[in-house]
């Protein structure tokens, strides 16, 4: 079967012996364009089988099958006997012989044998045989003018490699020319196969043919499909590769040779006159193509593709109902291509043939209405056994197939031949495309080796880190390749820092928005994109002289803790040799004690915070996190460099106190893992001696001496919870160090070594560079702990930068930080989701780069952090997934990558906040106080409200000019907007952008009683987070978002869970941003985002439209409402003209006012603009659009109008009642559960304010 047919979805022939009849799609005949044309063949289907359709439309110019004057066709080399073909074949009668009705030139004719005529041994049923013309016999028709015709070389002449399909050839190889290899089954054989392929010579006219085996018997000479052809057809011969039953054989008849009669079941295009000499007809099912006379008059309309066959056979003989046209005859002098794409032939059913129709009927256009009942027979005859054609395109120029046709064949078919080959190669490329995609991840996995050399860059002198900021901006590519860095990080740390080598993968551009989403298997590739890029790149050095300053810590909003001014001693920049890698901030506090970050490699003081009694932490015991040594190989897989942090603190009150650390990195000294835990005296405040950071080549996880307690959960250096050797209550999953153990918590964790958003002035990005900290000059920055706490929502892990979900450690931690810090991320991972309150040095000069120091804000409320046990209980459970996703989306499961880190560290390939920072982002902007200023113009680049393993892409780089909207949303549903969020640019209130997995802030329950657990982030939630990001960005244009676009850009392979993900995204929008996703077009599934919190009067859409445009919109909406909810366009324009606004102006305040109203507002769905029916010329009217219904209300508009007129809204009683009714309905609608409102309540809207 031709490959062309395979492209169309047809079944391919059996690979071995012929099988029972297979019914495939009908023959598609290709109508060849003129030989001089390169246009592809035009497939056409025959008229319907009802045979009542007129063929008038199908008529084509009648080709004249005669050679140009004075030119005779070249003689053709006689063909030898092919193996195993039917009985003796008698040549057709000479041209001009007695033929009752001359057939149409170019029409395939099969003459039925007269009743009682001797039957030759029946060849394989369904074989189409055409006798070749005798050598020297005049061609029935010459090739198109200009076709070089030369005598084919004698059989056996070696043939050069045939030109590619479509290349005209001077002469075809003679039959029997050795061919190198035949094309695969289904390859159109329009062009001769390469030399070397043995070709059986078609038999010369009259050559007796061997008896074929019965139908279904495999034939000796034809190989099974896929093997080299034993008999590649000579040019002009249509031969199936295996001459199994149903093979078409075309042999040009020699002029003057008696025509072999076709079998009774043969499909006949012309009844043979009774006077024609009849030869022994071939067996049943053989289709004999007989050449018509050279200049036979046309008594029937030319069959332009529609088979005009008329069965003529004795009634006693069965005939095969021709279900498909046999050939399409092209216009004059162009090759006729018989394109059998998926032709299937089987032994024709024994259908008794009706009386022979008179030939005259063929002259009428409705030639399909042959009286013969055979034409109404079931469509079976030709659809039985699949024909495995090696040459699906047989091109001949005359019914008497001449061997000189190939030249035109190559000219005519080229359109056809180029067509199918592209089609055939097409599918293979398509099938090969997936492999390419599957190979993409390996490419990504190979990239990391380049980065393995990068860690040294990060473990270098402070100067290196000063260069990091630019590096961070260029992180995205580096991030994907970071994992290997982590794998070799500990060894690199133990070694002397190699010379800094700038990472080659420094991309200055940030990945575009949602396009940063990984490819469809994004979450599996994500593992390789979860590392802070800074570790891989070195940036230009920017030496800074950090001045010593004191930073008055501004009290955080929300639950607060007294925060005295913290003196920040100045520390000189580290010297390169002394620089050691200090992991990210890690805190450990006894249960009920404020978490105390202890690991800041710069000179920083952590001010102790006297918490208010209401928010006091009650230390009930001092459980510990015990770091169990891991196998060396496992530790090697873990990214964090091995850095021992010896706890030199003198102690701290077990409760209500945050420790103050002063860690000048330059004082790093070697200290063993046996750092003892000094007791924490109850001092109001104290200065801790410099912590000693040691990078030692000890075991990956050096056991440190901590106070052993009933730690509910232990952290592996990679940050996962492990079952404690003391407390064995954990499940077996918790006790495993296998990848399964790391797999579960990954999605649940929002860790990035300090990817905790901080104002730009705080140089938050640097805080995310754990490896770089050791090189940062310590600028005096103090961070007072903040007590602002946001309740966690079970189904929505907030996009706060530090929402540590899953195995985040709880307040049940050692009173001090004596354990060795193995992973800069593990440290952060061990933190519960408590707010980080960055309070940068406001007085630091611009020259000094703010040290990315963060203090783990001691959550003031007891419920601010979940216990380690609680937090880890869910962390070890695999994230919830739909069954379908679980089966299909294995790449979405949190799996252990080659470094032993869970994907949580580098779960998303999207831009990280540090990737967007330039050098200026790392500098304190000015002495102005920006300690809590999340509205800082450059803050968006320094923070990311969704920074989590699964949401780092959501808002990083997506924040608008003001990031407050991206941050204020992460208060829990019950938290007010004012809870620690300041939207004024100069605000000194630290913004708390984190959610604590705990009960609401109002609860005073202790941690033991707090059972709220952070749930793992399922793949659907990850997609929902990405969808939220996508929607927020798309909403800036105020244009509805199509569901199909969401699926294409974000959901991808999760389109089956599309509605579920959209609902989750809607819930996140409501909880986080106060927005709501509404479906405004249920037919096209278009969505918009509205402000669910409602707008204050006069502030309807001012956030998106400037005041003038907003006023114009309100005027138009109010006019529409007052005029009966529908106003003609001219009335609105006239009204605006009376107000002094000429809509024809294009340079006014609104620019093109008419375009603004009729296009922009309409596109944004504030207005609906429709034509008034039956108006000529067309007139249009305006109505409220769906967005107007959702974002405002009639009552608001009425109040707006009343305010303009200085009246009471009730001055318009009718409109007031209408607006009031709408308000009541909205109130009723709002009373329903919000979950039911989801994203599919196109008409629900918030109550008016």
UniProtKB/Swiss-Prot annotation:
Ranges annotated as spanning the membrane: none
Keyword annotations: Autism spectrum disorder, Biological rhythms, Cytoplasm, Endosome, Intellectual disability, Nucleus, Obesity, Repressor, Transcription, Transcription regulation, Transport, Ubl conjugation pathway
Compositionally biased tracts (Basic residues): 881-891
Pro residues composition bias: residue spans: 40-49, 140-233, 312-324, 349-358, 410-432, 553-567
One function term, GO molecular function aspect: ubiquitin-protein transferase activity
Biased composition, class Polar residues, residue ranges: 1-10, 369-378
Assembly: Part of a complex consisting of MAGEL2, TRIM27 and USP7; directly interacts with USP7. Interacts with TRIM27. Interacts with VPS35; leading to recruitment at retromer-containing endosomes. Interacts with BMAL1 and PER2.
Protein name (database record): MAGE-like protein 2
Organism lineage: Eukaryota, Metazoa, Chordata, Craniata, Vertebrata
The gene coding this protein: MAGEL2
